[in-house]
């Protein structure tokens, strides 16, 4: 296993659930990049790392991904984990495969993606409702907002899957049999 691992993909695909399981079973420290990005938005708005840029959801994803990839590489390069028995387990939505390939050292940091693109937006909306909890920011959104979000999550899932295929990166569909898919990933990591 690599010193560091990124679990990336769309919201409610199982990233945080998988990261919690990985952190319990392997020598990794779970880092949620949602919190880091929220910090950038609030304290350093001049960086352009913001989910509220007035852009389409797809364009916002691309902008944040392109800006966060070198930040992640700087975290890896810092050497803070080199002397530890554990590495970083980075849980992240806004990192496209093309930015991982172009800006992050794969010798030191592996990646896998979780998506929900083999569904219609309506099916994706129902998945969101199934897995939302009061701890999730989406839990408090209206059904209308969630249905709009489901459309872009399906589109982003398909973009991520296409880029993963192009670059030979692991991508897992979690729209159906999510628990089994996540368990299969854990088994692969154990080998």
Please provide the spans of the model-predicted regions.
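A glycine- and Lys/Arg-enriched "phosphate-lid" helix/loop adjacent to the NTP-binding pocket
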Residues: 110-156
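Hydrophobic anchor at the beta1->P-loop junction of P-loop NTPases
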Residues: 7
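Conserved Walker
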Residues: 17
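Conserved glycine(s) of the Walker
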Residues: 14
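The conserved Walker
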Residues: 11
